[in-house]
């Protein structure tokens, strides 16, 4: 079962999306702050991160930057911030997608599946190359 870290501080959004993700077969951990997100990320292995931009103690950009220092885990920004500068910043920092709220739930689920599918394909290709002594 694939595991998602959902970083969001709005309780009304957390419950609905977490329920939907779990009903779709994902395990979901939620963090409401940058500090909590980074602690969970260091402690657990995740297949995908969903990040809000605005958090009580910083930004999703802070989480993305810290994660990108040590990991290639897929990251999707899921936020109300639709300013072009935020979108460009998120993608330039290494996010795989940037989705603005309000979003269509089925579209989000399809994007998550597509990103996880690509991530798994790259992981398998990497393992195959390492197994054959090619790197």
List the model feature ranges, each with a label.
Residues 1-120:
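N-terminal/domain-start alpha-helical segments
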């Amino acid at each position: 079962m694939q595991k998602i870290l959902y970083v969001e501080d709005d309780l009304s959004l957390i419950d609905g999306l977490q329920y939907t993700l779990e009903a779709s077969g994902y395990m979901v951990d939620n963090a409401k702050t940058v500090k909590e997100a980074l602690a969970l990320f260091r402690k657990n292995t995740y297949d995908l991160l969903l990040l809000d931009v605005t958090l009580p103690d910083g930004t999703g950009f802070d989480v993305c930057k810290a994660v990108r220092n040590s990991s290639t885990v897929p990251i999707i920004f899921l936020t109300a911030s639709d300013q072009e500068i935020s979108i460009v910043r998120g993608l330039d920092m290494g996010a795989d997608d940037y989705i603005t709220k309000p979003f269509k739930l089925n579209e989000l689920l399809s994007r998550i599946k597509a990103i996880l599918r690509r991530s798994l394909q790259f992981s398998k290709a990497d393992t195959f190359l390492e197994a054959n002594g090619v790197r």
